[in-house]
């Protein structure tokens, strides 16, 4: 299946030109769209276990071919050996540029329990990578004009989750961010697509005994409440996460591990 339509392209992300489940013998999906990196079509393909790819590599290869035509590079080739050498060098350059663009476009996203260190570690990663940092809880409070506990008390959890998802959809379709999510972002399945379309998701873990309690937050008011929360959310974190990083030392150590893991993930994706 090859999608050559603009359906699902930024900024109108999250829509698909068709449903892949209607094609039980489908062997592969190629979407020419590269913004976002994973359209709704590609996310469905991944869920169904169907091999798939976006159009970013083709974009770079097309640009390289155009450059050769514009500069008439092939006119200067005097023998087949030179032609092969030029083609091999071109392929290496295409892969390098593709890898650079992929890494620049991909968001590094932290999920995990409240108090696991997502904001602190995320900010350190953003500084190390030279990227903008977005803490979705901070953005929520700024836009709502009140704290999250106050919003919970005034409007309830359902209204909070609605607004949280809207913010996730807005930032998830952008690229090149380090993003720290609220602990409950995994409670709504729709948020997976919002975050995964351009993101590598890191589950930042920390023992419950080390997580802070906050009486003003009903969902994490006590150690018992946190244990119950972790029991419910653990499979959801596992479902969302691409990588798991333990934050059991200093924030700097966790950030260093996260940056290294993210870089490794990008190198693997660019091969």
Predicted features by range, described:
Residues 197-236, 243:
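A glycine- and Lys/Arg-enriched "phosphate-lid" helix/loop adjacent to the NTP-binding pocket
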Residues 110:
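Hydrophobic anchor at the beta1->P-loop junction of P-loop NTPases
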Residues 132, 138-196:
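ATP-dependent small-molecule kinase phosphotransfer cores
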Residues 88, 92-104, 124, 128, ...:
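NTP-dependent small-molecule kinase module
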Residues 118:
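Conserved lysine of the Walker
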Residues 9-29, 40, 44, 187-192:
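Rossmann-fold NAD(P) dinucleotide-binding segment
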Residues 27-69:
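Rossmann-fold NAD(P)-binding glycine/threonine-rich loop
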Residues 113:
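P-loop (Walker A) phosphate-binding loop of NTP-binding proteins
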């Amino acid at each position: 299946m090859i999608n050559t339509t603009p359906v699902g392209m930024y900024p109108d992300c999250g829509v698909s030109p068709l449903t892949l489940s209607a094609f039980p013998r489908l062997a592969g999906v190629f979407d020419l769209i590269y913004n976002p990196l994973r359209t709704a079509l590609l996310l469905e393909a991944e869920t169904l276990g169907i091999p798939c790819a976006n159009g970013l590599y083709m974009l770079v290869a097309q640009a390289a071919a155009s450059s050769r035509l514009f500069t008439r590079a092939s006119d200067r080739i005097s023998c087949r050996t030179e032609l092969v050498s030029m083609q091999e060098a071109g392929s290496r350059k295409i892969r390098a540029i593709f890898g650079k663009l992929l890494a620049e476009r991909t968001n590094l996203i932290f999920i995990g329990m409240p108090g696991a260190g997502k904001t602190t570690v995320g900010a350190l990663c953003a500084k190390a990578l030279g990227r903008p940092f977005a803490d979705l809880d901070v953005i929520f409070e700024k836009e709502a004009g009140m704290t999250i506990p106050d919003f919970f008390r005034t409007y309830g959890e359902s209204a909070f989750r609605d607004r949280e998802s809207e913010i996730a959809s807005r930032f998830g379709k952008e690229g090149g961010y380090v993003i720290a999510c609220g602990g409950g972002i995994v409670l709504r399945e729709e948020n997976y697509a919002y975050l995964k379309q351009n993101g590598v998701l890191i589950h930042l873990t920390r023992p419950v005994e080390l997580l802070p309690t906050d009486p003003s937050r009903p969902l994490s008011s006590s150690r018992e409440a946190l244990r119950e929360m972790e029991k419910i959310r653990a499979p959801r974190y596992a479902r969302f996460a691409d990588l798991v990083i333990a934050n059991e030392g200093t924030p700097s150590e966790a950030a260093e591990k996260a940056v290294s893991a993210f870089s490794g993930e990008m190198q693997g994706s660019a091969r």
